[in-house]
């Protein structure tokens, strides 16, 4: 895997800060509480994969949240443009990050193995 340029890393870092601000300005309370885990921009910065964390949302709620985010993408992009002073903003593609769920399941398995070894 190639290393990302410093400029691309800076863009991703800035988006990781600005997107939660943009989400907090929306009227939908489900979107206000979302956490941004990671932002991964394409090389040309035309697209950005935004990985979100909503630990207590059911799969149905997650589908609805993604639908609402697609509808609010223009507002989020406008906020990012005004907050950063950029002339263009990448198109956002929202996904839920399930790595924390996987890590929690692995921790539970390791804890169970530890208890079995002790007994």
Swiss-Prot record:
HAMAP family: RbfA. This is Ribosome-binding factor A. Its main location: cytoplasm. Monomer. Binds 30S ribosomal subunits, but not 50S ribosomal subunits or 70S ribosomes. One of several proteins that assist in the late maturation steps of the functional core of the 30S ribosomal subunit. Associates with free 30S ribosomal subunits (but not with 30S subunits that are part of 70S ribosomes or polysomes). Required for efficient processing of 16S rRNA. May interact with the 5'-terminal helix region of 16S rRNA. Keywords: Cytoplasm, Ribosome biogenesis. One of its GO terms (biological process) is maturation of SSU-rRNA.
């Amino acid at each position: 895997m190639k290393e990302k340029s410093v400029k691309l890393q800076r863009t991703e870092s800035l988006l990781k800060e600005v997107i939660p601000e943009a989400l907090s300005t929306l009227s939908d309370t489900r979107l206000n509480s979302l956490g941004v885990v990671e932002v991964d921009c394409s090389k040309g910065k035309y697209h950005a994969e935004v990985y979100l964390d909503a630990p207590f949302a059911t799969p149905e709620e997650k589908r609805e949240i993604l639908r609402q985010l697609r509808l609010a993408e223009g507002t989020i992009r406008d906020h990012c443009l005004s907050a950063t002073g950029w002339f263009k903003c990448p198109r956002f593609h929202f996904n839920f990050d399930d790595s924390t769920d996987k890590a929690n399941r692995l921790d539970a398995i390791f804890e169970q193995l530890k208890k079995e070894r002790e007994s």
